[in-house]
Amino acid sequence: MYETTVRILRGDRSGTRGHQEFRAQIDEGMMVLDVVHQVQSQHANDLAVRWNCKAGKCGSCSAEINGKPRLMCMTRVNELPKDQPITIEPMKRFPLIKDLVTDVSFNYRMNKTIPPFKPAPRPADGVYRMMQIDVDRIQEFHKCIECFLCQNVCHVMRDHGHEDFAGPRFFIRIAALAMHPLDTRSRLQQLKDAHGLGLCNITKCCTEVCPEHIHITDNAIIPLKERVAGAFYDPLAWIWRKVLGKQAEQKQAP
């Protein structure tokens, strides 16, 4: 057991913010969330913190620990430098509610704009069939726990504003839908325009902070970029669409 200093950035919607220091007793195996609960219990009963499972599966306790976006419940104190304070701050890219709690409602609004899964009609025998390789491809995306650390660290969201860019979390969701072998709905136009996929310049900062180790950039964003490029910027594809469009118009003509 040893004692250390914990610096927590405190504030609320009024704009008043400042670091407050506390002393905490550190036991073997403690997580940063345990330290926050100790501070809340012994020193600052009004400290606001969002948490739920304490097992790295709910994504609730996202914060910035010593400047790095991480889950508090999965960050071991003994992995942090002992010669400096443990600095805990809320996610910087979302509006502050109070102390370590931020308003992440933008993400839920964005989620509603994504067209849902639309399966192909059932075959005559009523049984859907898929290749295992296609099923395996999208399993990684389903590991997302919606901690929104990728949204927080994405510099495009920092520079361009929330409403102009869906963010890595939702490119994962769209990739899971688009790569599903039974899905029939196209979301490419929306990706290109409303969701701003082209703004991403694949720096992989989102991949680096993902607690589920999802290869967001390589396995979701880049394949989506390739599909958008093929659909809208390939000259042969453009000519082919024009030809099909004219044929459709001729068929509809009286």
Summary of predicted features, one role per range:
Residues 30-42, 89-254:
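Ferredoxin-type iron-sulfur electron-transfer modules in oxidoreductases and energy-metabolism complexes
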Residues 2-107, 141, 151, 155, ...:
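Iron-sulfur-associated redox domains of electron-transfer enzymes in respiratory
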